[in-house]
Design a protein with these regions (language model features):
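Mobile late-domain/C-terminal helix-loop "cap" segments
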Residues: 382-440
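Accessory "access/gating" subregions that flank catalytic or transport cores
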Residues: 274, 278-334, 339-342, 347
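Structured beta-strand/loop patches that form or line metal/cofactor-binding pockets in enzymes
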Residues: 37-66
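Single conserved hydrophobic/aromatic residue that forms the stacking wall/gate
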Residues: 1-5, 9
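Rossmann-fold NAD(P)-binding glycine/threonine-rich loop
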Residues: 316-384
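Glycine/serine-rich phosphate-binding loop and adjoining beta1-alpha1 elements at the start
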Residues: 91, 110-224
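Glycine-rich phosphate/diphosphate-binding loop of Rossmann-like nucleotide-binding domains
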Residues: 191, 196-306
Length: 442
């Protein structure tokens, strides 16, 4: 695998993408080298390159009548096991490196769910923050004027991501329907009134807690009464806080770009609902939480990983937990780290966790609940059915249990330590690899 990897590592300017590729290649090198047929078929060289990338301009008119221009992207990474599947991100930081990394990760994450979904990702450097509802609608419609020709229920099924919630998905789906004159399950994360699935908004957080709970159970540890640090305060964090509280844990932090809130009384009940109000305000800050709940403390400009807790759950964005943060958590005797955000931990943090034999699981395993429930939405759309919240939640729980079992199967080392990074990467890789081999050189 080293010769194939060296060509990838020489690339410049795609740091996020290279970070994701390196992590996977290091995990799979032993099992890859046991399969000479993979090398003969140049499997790695084919796997690390997207099938295709679409880049396009998105001109739209703001409320002042001025034309604005943003860049739009769709990365169709791999469809060996099903239609391309992955979210759309609207954020000023969006670039091709980030979307390639997300599409690459999505390929293996989707494989872990056992549902027939390939990997893809898309987005734009457009930021919804500070924009009016009318401006967001016009941008979404302009974005779809190009994207519609590249997506479809059996070709490529987008969903939401950072900056893209139910409102944006609704606007994009409406424009897609207008252009194609078809009502199909081309998007997931839709409103319940037009084909959406129950549990979808909270699914990533719910699934993350199901996985973390299984990690703890596997070690004979009960999650009840454990303290939890959560970063972020959007849908993912909200789902994680809700399910952690339901399982009997006590969440004591949330965070935003302005800093973090520490609430020693625990974030539960109406405080969880207030998280949604904070997000809906559009201000992207968590400081008002401490004003509303005086027992809570707001710490400006810092991350929550300095708080002594039993469980740490990054739920915000990539590389939000670094090596220094990891050392703080280890020093404070954290029991478990579940990376619910995509690539939430830096390589230095991951190395520290694994070197210290910590219970640590990567995003492609822990946060697969979101795309798993998207897959369940696709199934409901295809069958023209709607399942109850309990049916969806039960299926989600079953899928997350199955992902955990795959990680244990492939990640258990001779000394008994479970390397969840290795386990998740090998399990996802083997499924995609066998599918690619069976379909020939295409």
């Amino acid at each position: 695998i080293s010769s194939a990897a060296s060509d990838v590592y020489k690339r410049q300017g795609e740091s996020e993408y290279l970070q994701a590729v390196k992590e996977v290649l290091l995990s799979i090198q032993d099992i890859y080298n046991q399969h000479p047929e993979f090398e003969k078929a140049s499997l790695i060289e084919r796997l690390v390159e997207p099938d295709r990338i679409f880049t396009f301009k998105v001109p739209w008119v703001d409320d002042k009548g001025k034309v604005q221009v943003n860049l739009g992207y769709r990365v169709q990474f791999n469809n060996a096991i099903g239609p391309y599947k992955g979210g759309i991100r609207f954020h000023a930081s969006v670039n091709l490196s980030i979307l390639k990394f997300l599409g690459f990760e999505q390929t293996f994450k989707n494989a872990l769910t056992t549902l027939p979904m390939g990997g893809g990702k898309g987005g734009s450097d457009f930021s919804p923050r500070g924009k009016s509802d009318a401006e967001i609608m016009r941008f979404c419609q302009a974005f779809m004027l190009e994207l519609w020709r590249h997506v479809g229920p059996d070709m490529d099924v987008p969903a939401g991501d950072i900056g893209v919630g139910g409102r944006e998905v609704g606007y994009m789906f409406g424009m897609y329907k207008k252009l194609t004159r078809e009502f199909t399950g081309t998007f997931t994360g839709k409103g319940l009134e037009f084909g959406g699935s129950l549990i979808r908004p909270e699914a990533t957080g719910f699934g993350g807690l199901y996985f973390v709970n299984q990690m703890l159970k596997n070690k004979g540890i009960d999650i009840k009464g454990k303290t939890v640090a959560v970063s972020g305060f959007g849908n993912v964090a909200w789902g994680a806080v809700t399910k952690a509280t339901e399982l009997g844990a006590k969440v004591v932090t949330i965070s935003g770009p302005d800093g973090y809130v520490y609430d020693p009384d625990g974030i539960s009940g109406d405080k969880i609902d207030y998280m949604l109000e904070l997000r809906a305000s559009g201000n992207d800050i968590v400081a008002p939480y401490a004003e509303k709940y005086p027992n809570a403390k707001f710490v400006a400009g810092r991350r929550p990983w300095e708080v002594k807790v039993d469980i740490a759950l990054p739920c915000a964005t990539q590389n939000e937990l670094n090596g220094e943060d990891a050392c703080n958590l280890i020093k404070n005797s954290v029991l478990c780290i579940g990376e619910i955000s995509n690539m939430g931990c830096t390589p230095e943090a991951i190395d520290a966790f694994i070197e210290n034999k910590m219970l640590y699981a990567p995003g492609k395993a822990v946060n697969a609940g979101g795309v798993a429930t998207s897959g369940l939405e696709m199934s409901q759309n295809a069958m023209h059915m709607s399942w109850s919240a309990k049916e969806v939640d039960d299926k989600l729980h079953q899928i997350m249990y199955g992902i955990h079992e795959q990680c244990v199967k492939y990640g258990t080392e001779p000394d008994g330590y479970i390397n969840y990074v290795k386990g998740a990467n090998i399990a996802g890789f083997m499924k995609v690899a066998h599918a690619m081999m069976a379909q020939g050189i295409v």
